[in-house]
């Protein structure tokens, strides 16, 4: 069995697709499953129980799908022959006019039979988001009520995480201060107020600050560094699979509606997440260890005492 999944999006978008990929793997445990999408995100599932190969969706060949003449896909070209080698194609790419479905139909894919093509809207309309992507598989007889994403770091991932933290285990608190969007980001000073209180409560725990591209300026901000607890490790530039292993060593993740938050939840780390304009019913990772705090679209309306209380609850349970 060969399966191709077309799924774009950022890091969090991939992680919320994992329950659907898990359904495919459970139904066809020995299938060869490939994905065309964001390779830096999809590496989380590559050779880690979900995917056997990943293709960057921005490669020129993928632009042939759904294209008009003279760039339209031809049945006799090698790319078309390769696509036709799959028995099942799941499309989560936008296809408003059905052009991608048309091309796969030209290659002999139907709604049933020896070559099956299933298309589903790219934008979730069912909460949580993972449920939306699982719904695409219902015509195949696949269904679930478990929408929690799960990641499985390898021994190499864990070794890399241990080297980054200079420890083989222990209890850490992870904090990702950014979100990629100012409207989704709780003020840094408020986070620092929470962290100082937690540091006083839990002197034995190390703070791990995770910085992405959007927060790179904080790494060089000496004033901010002075505000952090003494036992603080600042990490930047780690690939997603190493982040997953790092979060396995953490008892709490503090952050927002971000890809790293979804990764942390997927390895079982308890999370306290501050939400603003995005709906946590749709975008917060589902699960009992997740506390999503929100008061409407203004992220600033969430208070320091609320976040501190949620963090203390999470740490008290771990």
Where are these regions (language model features)?
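Catalytic machinery of carbohydrate-active enzymes
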Residues: 1-318
